[in-house]
Amino acid sequence: MSDDNRVYIFDTTLRDGEQSPGATMTREEKVRMARQLETLGVDIIEAGFPAASEGDFQAVSAIAAAVKTPVVAALCRALASDIDRGFEAIKGAQRRRIHTFLATSELHMQHKLNKTPTQVLDMIEAAVSHAASKGVEVQFSAEDASRSEPAFLVAACERAINAGATILNIPDTVGYAQPAEFAELIRHLMTTVRGAGGVTFAVHCHNDLGLAVANTLAALHAGARQAEVTLSGIGERAGNASLEQVVMGLNTRPNYYNLTTGIVTEELFPSCRRLSGIIGQPIPPYAPIMGRNAFAHESGIHQHGVLKDRRTYEIMTAESIGRKGAVVVLGKHSGRHALDAKVKELGYALNDEELLVVFVAVKQLADRKQRILDEDIEALILEKVLRRPDRYALQFLSVHCGNVELAPFAVVEMQVEGQTVRHYSAGSGPVDAVFNAVCQAVGRKPDLEEYQINAITGGTDAQGEVTVRIKDGTATTVGRGVHDDVIMASTLAFINALNRLAKKEEERTCPQL
């Protein structure tokens, strides 16, 4: 298959994906995800928006230094100062790209930019030319392209090409496009824009109408060769096109698309699990490809067919996306070498000290649980090793509840910014009592917007995974806690969310595409 059939995967999980409410990541977490994206085989990592804040600049710089194979892209507004800042952030990368953008729809030009079409074209030329002078790849995105006048969009693309852009991105910024018309728009641009033969056309689709993946695949079928996607489809509002769905859409229909990617599909599930653990947002059970129901069959007719031949109701294998679900024979008498091998198989690189921490946790869990599964080990790694340093830490918890007239109450002892504090509080139930006591200890009272419990594995001795979403003012964060005691898991999740809230970087204006 020729290079003309190669689709380049541009992952924007660390930039657009992070704009999903509650999905904020620290610099260290972004670096960990970037390394996993490199293992996954993505071609381009959009590391962030360096001009937004010093924290974003430092994160992009750290990612640029950490990965070797992917191109590292910095998002910049069509401003020389943004482009200079972006270049400084990625200059340590082995392969670099400046991604600059400007809106081209009448709505955006008039009401957001307050610019005339002529002024916008001049800004595109100036920004792309300035970026090209840095000696790096230059990508231009026409924000809100799907609602732009086609003739003006052609003019904007031509101005960008003449100024030095080699990648033209056509975003469906608000998820407005329909697959057939979006494909036609791509074909129109590729046949009408002067110089189109020398550039790569890309698409960046949002999911407001649930069509992000369909629009992306339609555009690729029409000739676009770069797909801008995120793991699990996380992103602004209803999210972005899902990386795993786009890739497996191409993989399962080779005779239709005749397109390939460089993605190692066996790393898809580990990558989505890794992201889920970092941002504290569980993968929905009904999520295509990644959800726990994706390879489950309840109907008797379906079960009969699958038992005869899995291809009757499965269009891909669980193994092809890295879902193994194997039982790990680890327990009280297992050694560190066995654990080390399993940790590496799961895709984690732990030093001796970190491995010891997980080993002790596995031993403790084995005292309470008969079988230790892959999911258990990964949950312990995320909980014990990869959790961000905490401003608030739980030291002691006691909860009383029952069917007596005494209201449920909780006693917590915590480290709060280096000081030990102890508080008692009652509540309408044990979880409410714990949350009230924790709030008193840390001195803040956020609103609890969401509370979810999931069993990581089956059985009455399964570890419970609790996810909470809290809001304090305009700031929203998600926390995650894992324990075989649901009350303890709930407490850990709430404290994790409070830590994320406390460490959230200064508010910044996030760009749209």
UniProtKB/Swiss-Prot annotation:
Involved pathway(s): Amino-acid biosynthesis; L-leucine biosynthesis; L-leucine from 3-methyl-2-oxobutanoate: step 1/4
Location within or outside the cell: Cytoplasm
InterPro entries found in the cross-reference section: 2-IPM_HCS-like (IPR050073), 2-isopropylmalate_synth_dimer (IPR013709), AIPM/Hcit_synth_CS (IPR002034), Aldolase_TIM (IPR013785), LeuA/HCS_post-cat (IPR054691), LeuA_allosteric_dom_sf (IPR036230), LeuA_bact_synth (IPR005671), PYR_CT (IPR000891)
Description of how the protein assembles with itself and partners: Homodimer.
Catalytic activity reported: 3-methyl-2-oxobutanoate + acetyl-CoA + H2O = (2S)-2-isopropylmalate + CoA + H(+)
Organism expressing this protein natively: Solidesulfovibrio magneticus (strain ATCC 700980 / DSM 13731 / RS-1)
GO cellular component, one term: cytoplasm
A UniProt-annotated Pfam family: HMGL-like
SUPFAM superfamilies: 2-isopropylmalate synthase LeuA, allosteric (dimerisation) domain (SSF110921), Aldolase (SSF51569)
Molecular-function GO term, any one: 2-isopropylmalate synthase activity
Cofactor(s), by name: Mn(2+)
EC numbers for this chain: 2.3.3.13
Protein name: 2-isopropylmalate synthase
Keywords carried by this UniProt record: Amino-acid biosynthesis, Branched-chain amino acid biosynthesis, Cytoplasm, Leucine biosynthesis, Manganese, Metal-binding, Transferase
Domain Pyruvate carboxyltransferase per the UniProt entry, residue ranges: 7-269
Transmembrane intervals: none
Reported function: Catalyzes the condensation of the acetyl group of acetyl-CoA with 3-methyl-2-oxobutanoate (2-ketoisovalerate) to form 3-carboxy-3-hydroxy-4-methylpentanoate (2-isopropylmalate).
Any one biological process term the GO annotation gives: L-leucine biosynthetic process
